[in-house]
């Protein structure tokens, strides 16, 4: 079967096989070595030099074209308006389901883009930091919907992106701990006018309801100049999630500080059943209701197979 056959519904996209996409790298240099690539890889994600060369280097080349075009537009509009404005950062959104490999993709892009010439400043922020603290979610009865749109402090996230896009100095982003499964009190990442900002999260392409009064209602993706959606079939995502859960049971869950410490003693059978239950109760519902419907809003869609390797790419037509 043609690799693009299951992507026919991605119109208005141009769909490329892996080989076709890889050919668009042209002379883009490889700036990472094997050890650096391994350090960027998340648990159970597959990332090697060939994946970087065939998938991410063409992305890097495409992004360099978009960034250059945006810079030209910025200077042209500045001349048109007759004003001197701060240069706005180029913002890239990375979206997709839990366990699909968003963090790996975001880190690889950050590493590659930071080595462009001249060297731009490239920062990375995850939207996990903009989740409401657990105490707030518990009071609202939303702990079982953590990661759903309603579990985020959307005004804070929109305010952060607005400050970044307007060129403000030293903008703070809250820090989230995957160990404690909660916001770290009084700890922040400081973003100081980067050239490029990568924003990674499950719902970054989420749309809002249309206003009845015609007033503008901003959404996170309004601030993006380019967006990437990591895609995989649901049974594959579930398998990856279960595998990750089992791996964490044997590692991070053994830390007494871990929110999931109680799962460290589960047998393989018990841990698998628990992971599947969490997937079906929370992650599957979020995927079907909130994440997957945003896929057609992405600039670029990377479709992964069961081996974690990208087998086709869909690029939105201009």
From Swiss-Prot:
Q: Could you name the domain of life of the organism this protein comes from?
A: Bacteria
Q: Recorded E.C. number(s)?
A: 2.7.1.33
Q: Where in the cell is it found?
A: Cytoplasm
CDD domains from the entry?
A: PanK (cd02025)
One Gene Ontology term of the biological-process aspect is: coenzyme A biosynthetic process
Listed GO MF terms: ATP binding; pantothenate kinase activity
Q: What class of enzyme is it?
A: transferase
Keywords per UniProt = ATP-binding, Coenzyme A biosynthesis, Cytoplasm, Kinase, Nucleotide-binding, Transferase
Recorded protein name is Pantothenate kinase
- Species this chain originates from: Rhodopseudomonas palustris (strain TIE-1)
């Amino acid at each position: 079967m043609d690799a693009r056959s299951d992507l026919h519904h991605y119109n208005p996209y141009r769909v490329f096989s892996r080989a076709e996409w890889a050919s668009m790298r042209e002379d883009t240099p490889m700036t990472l070595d094997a050890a650096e690539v391994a350090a960027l890889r998340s648990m159970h994600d597959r990332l090697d030099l060939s994946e970087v060369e065939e998938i991410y280097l063409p992305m890097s080349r495409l992004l360099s074209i978009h960034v250059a075009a945006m810079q030209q537009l910025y200077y042209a509009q500045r001349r048109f308006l007759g004003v001197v404005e701060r240069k706005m950062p180029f913002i890239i959104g990375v979206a997709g389901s839990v366990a699909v490999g968003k963090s790996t993709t975001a880190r690889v892009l950050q590493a590659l883009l930071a080595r462009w010439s001249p060297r731009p400043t490239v920062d990375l922020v995850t939207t996990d930091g903009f989740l409401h603290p657990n105490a707030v979610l518990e009071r609202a009865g939303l702990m079982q919907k953590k990661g759903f749109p309603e579990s985020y402090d959307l005004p804070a996230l929109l305010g952060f992106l607005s400050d970044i896009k307007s060129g403000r100095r030293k903008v703070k982003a809250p820090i989230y701990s995957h160990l404690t499964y909660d916001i770290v009190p009084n700890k922040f990442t400081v973003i100081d006018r980067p050239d490029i900002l990568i924003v990674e999260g499950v719902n970054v392409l989420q749309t809002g309801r249309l206003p009845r009064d015609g007033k503008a209602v901003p959404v996170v993706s309004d601030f993006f100049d380019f967006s990437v959606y990591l895609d995989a079939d649901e049974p594959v995502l579930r398998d990856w999630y279960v595998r990750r859960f089992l791996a964490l049971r044997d590692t991070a869950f053994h830390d007494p500080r871990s929110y999931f410490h109680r799962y460290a003693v589960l047998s393989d059978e018990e841990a698998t059943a628990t992971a599947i239950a969490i997937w079906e109760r929370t992650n599957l519902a979020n995927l079907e209701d909130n994440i997957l419907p945003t896929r057609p809003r992405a600039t670029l869609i990377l479709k992964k197979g069961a081996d974690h390797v990208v087998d086709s790419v869909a690029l939105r037509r201009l």
